[in-house]
UniProtKB/Swiss-Prot annotation:
It comes from Caenorhabditis elegans. Residues 53-56, 129-133, 282-359 are cytoplasmic. Zn(2+) binds at C307, C310, C328, C331. The chain crosses the membrane at residues 25-52, 57-81, 107-128, 134-184, 254-281. Belongs to the pex2/pex10/pex12 family. Pathway: Protein modification; protein ubiquitination. It comes from the Eukaryota. Keywords: Membrane, Metal-binding, Peroxisome, Protein transport, Transmembrane, Transmembrane helix, Transport, Zinc, Zinc-finger. This is Peroxisome assembly protein 12. A zinc finger (RING-type) spans 307-346.
Amino acid sequence: MSTTIRASQLASSISPKTEEKQPSVFDIIAQENLATSIRPALQHLVKYLAFFKPKTFLSVHRNFDEYYIIFDLILQNHYLRNYGASFTENFYSMKRIASGTGNPPNDGRERIMSLITLVGWPYVENKLNQLYDRLKEVYECRSWSSINGMKAKCQKMFVIIWPYIKTALKAVKSALQLAYILNRSSIHSPWLYFSGVILKHLTPEDLEAFNAVPLHLQTGYQISRGTLNEHIHLRFFNRIWRFILGLPGIVSRLFAYGLFFVQFLDYMYNTDLAKLTKTGLDGAIPSPPHKMIISESEILSLDTNKCPICLKKRVNDTALFVSGYVFCYTCINQYVNTYNKCPVTGCPANVQHLIRLFV
């Protein structure tokens, strides 16, 4: 009888490991939205800094893709190695588990494949999208049959095939998400399949392991071996160690909140709400709308320092790459965002064709 009671007491004293649950589809959508918003938020911030400090940040703005992939590689590698998840997955209390071994992808093939899908593929996809937009705009005003050579044929094939590839990837992802919602699949994205991992929620044991103090710094390990003076020093180093362990989490939270703030600023300054709040406050009657296409003969009659859109002295000179004409930054940015063409030549254009002139 006593043996049975003792066994039951031992069994109750051992706390069972918390069951690992998969995140809900709402958590996954929130995580993916945050992941896709980091790059444009940082790009907007760099663009803002390049406007005020061109000597320091202009090169970063022009080569943003390359700087960002280095930053993203360091960030994701740190979180995969230490927390077994990407930055945004860790922010929403998720972790990656290798499908074959059940271990976190801290090392080995799973971590390399995770870095490829988290960092490498978004960079390649962004470059391919830029190439597609550039080729499509160039050949909109030309006939494919007028261009000969293997290079032109490859470009034509790419322009035709790339939208279908993107559509196929989106269809596969949508099918996996539907299967995930119906509990028919343990993954919601093809990139998790390529990485060989699945997503799970962090457990209390995981959080405790992240904040664990090494054995040689634990107070209980040293109190029986040292003097009171050594114990005081040990508590001091223990607190320093806990501060160091908590510092990355604090920085990551501040970084994420900063991204939300940058998104808010971008929404306030680049949406119709901003236009409504900026106009009509002083009661002045707005000027009549400008003629949207200006002939080149009219441009030649203007002073060299006048903007072809507002017909005033240019502010923040900005050249349009597709035509070579120079405008005010505000004028040409609003025009291109609205009409997607050059106001003089009518050639297709977008904001990527704007070149700031710092003279």
